Amino acid sequence: MKVESRSHNVHHAHGEEEKVMTRKQKAESKAHEVEHSPKKAKVEDEKNGHTNGKSASDVVQEYDEFCKATNEQLSLEQMKEILEANDLDSSGSDLEITRRCQDLLFFGALEKCMVCNGNMEFDGRRYGCRGFYSEWSSCTFSTREPPRKDEPIKLPDSVQNSPVSDLLKKYQDPSKRPQRDLGLAIKPFTGMMISLMGRLNRTHLNFSGASCLVASPAERDRGGTSKLADAMERGIPVVREAWLTDSIEKQEPQPLESYDLVSDLSVDGKGIPWDKQDPGEEAIESLSAELKLYGKRGVYKDTKLHEQDGKIFEKDGILYNCAFSLCDQGRKLNDYCVMQLIVVPENSLHLYFKKGRVGDDPSAEERLEECENVDNAIKEFVRLFEEITGNEFESWEREKKFQKKPLKFYPIDMDDGVEVRHGALGLRQLGIAATHCKLEPMVANFMKVLCSQEIYKYALMEMGYDSPDLPIGMVTNLHLKRCEEILLEFIEKVKTLKETGPKADAIWSDFSQKWFTLMHSTRPFIFRDYQEIADHAAAALEGVRDITLASHLIGDMSGSTIDDPLSDTYKKLGCSITPLEKNSNDYEMIVKYLEKTYEPVKVGDIEYGVSVENIFTVESSACPSYADIVKMPNKVLLWCGSRSSNLLRHLHKGFLPAICSLPVPGYMFGKAIVCSDAAAEAARYGFTAVDRPEGFLVLAIASLGNEITELKSPPEDTTSLEEKKVGVKGLGKKKTDESEHFVWKDDIKVPCGSIIASEHEDSPLEYNEYAVYDPKQVRISYLVGVKYEEKDAVIDTAE
């Protein structure tokens, strides 16, 4: 067996990775880590801040001396014996064992975690639980003031007779033990040695035992000095000075990777996990990254075997290609894994295995082996599957039976197809494809947009589901259904939640870890409220579902575009799209409706207006015909917001009801199709970024039925509305002026009017929303291509 080795140190130090901020947390400045403090188990003189007659500084000094003495007098083996004698975990690094043992001997044994009954442990900043809440998640409970057992520490014989025994016995009496006070201001760099270089306030170049090197930008610009190279060779992180100032400001060491200064100078490349990069830098990497695995038959690009016409090995109906995900917030894990058997011409068979973190290839565990025979290759593949998942391979592949195990990977069930980030048109292909397209030019340009990689890359990047190592836009319906079931189950649990405090937080944490294992994200976080569930779970799942369907419709356009792939995809839509004449009455009516009901989208202090680029009429076989819809009662022409990445699915399958019911806009009416009489509301969905000003708004004819229910607040239960399929109108803070409304052709109402304040100023809705529960009562009629433009912008034409 020939082995090609590549990189690679396994990158996980058990529970030692730095905490990072998610995109959501950075964007909204939600620094809301919740720390819960059980009833204090210490005696404190509140007047002078002393515990048991000793000041906090005295306790710190005494503990430092105690640690120095035990380090000198106790061996690591003796410390393990002490931990085992007190029924505590004796595994881990030397530092973890020592810190765990010294905390036990000096301050006393900790009580079990109040959430999961696991063991609590000091991590240098706070006490965190090391137990598991479920097979999907570690317990994430932490506190600065944990309760301790009111009992003496058990000392093994080897320690009883040691020179340090008298010192240890001094702290045996629980009533006389010092109390650790972590509520006071903590020095952010406790336990770290920091070296400085360059034009900083201080210079210190002794690297012995250094945790990191803080260097000036000038050192980076010079391409790396010998001193800087020395630090890199020793594996010492080199960071910008901002790391120091930010850590001091936030009173906690910030993740070193986010302040990296020079790792891109190393031979292996930058190697910073995406979830530890600044969101702006991560976005740039994401958009320029090449998808490495496009689906169940895709050969992982890092193998280079696709260049030799390599194919995924198939036997007895099984494709030997698996992808996995694991997100564990308690252990700071967010990993993917890929394993494949690849056949190249002349029957050469290779086993490929890779496990790591997105963006950190230099630290990934990776192997590519040429196999001597098929049977041995299959045995090794099956062994690896069972090792990383704890499940049998064939039970998964043939029956999709799988039981998640703690800290084990879960399969991402890839579908047999080509994900759009690979199969759709790249930037260089777009012009050629449109030139060769036989469709009407405006329609060809429209299809060019919907068949481009760009809109799908942006959508996945903005949702945080943009891993280049996993084809999240080419998963099976079964996988999507599992995600939906877990989401609905969690929402039901939260709505009837009786637990409070840490136990309620644990339920949210468990769901978050489960969710981001099933839906691998480059920026996982712990959900805290319904709005985050709506934005980052429900809407994201709907988006991934729509992108998956787009992947199947588009197929693989990565080859020649001479065969007119745009026309081929257009035919698959089962939909007729025709440009609307700009001098027609319908065109003028739609422009008027847009201008009357639009309010500028605000981004920071800048407002964006909108202009109409073109309008298309739509005849979709997935929607009721015009002849059928006009026979229905209470017909209204309404605006629907949609991302460009969702449009292929809408045109091919029609609108689908929302995936769940949540007490937030867009989901508060349950599993309904939601529209608005305000173009402003639809525009908020269609507008994604200032550097991508083009978008589409949908105009649909909706029949609200004979009975319309008006609601001023979210209904407690949407089940009856969903069952009766009645039309619902949610009353917003703003409405369109009813005196300006008019009736269009065939008794279709157009609520076109200036936006004015309503009498419902306490409504959770900004504008009126209309909910329809039966897709057969909604007909997509027009697509309005718009361009968002900065208001009052002055273009400088001076040279």
Curated annotation (Swiss-Prot):
Boundaries of every WGR domain copy: 309-409
Gene3D superfamilies: 1.10.20.130, 2.20.25.630, 3.90.228.10, BRCT domain, Poly(ADP-ribose) polymerase, regulatory domain
GO molecular function, one term: zinc ion binding
Chain spans, region Zinc ribbon: 108-152
PANTHER family: DNA LIGASE (PTHR10459), PROTEIN ADP-RIBOSYLTRANSFERASE PARP3 (PTHR10459:SF106)
PARP alpha-helical domain span: 436-555
BRCT domain ranges (all copies): 189-261
Name recorded for this polypeptide: Protein ADP-ribosyltransferase PARP3
Keywords for the protein's UniProt record, in alphabetical order: ADP-ribosylation, DNA-binding, Glycosyltransferase, Metal-binding, NAD, Nucleotidyltransferase, Nucleus, Transferase, Zinc, Zinc-finger
EC category name: transferase
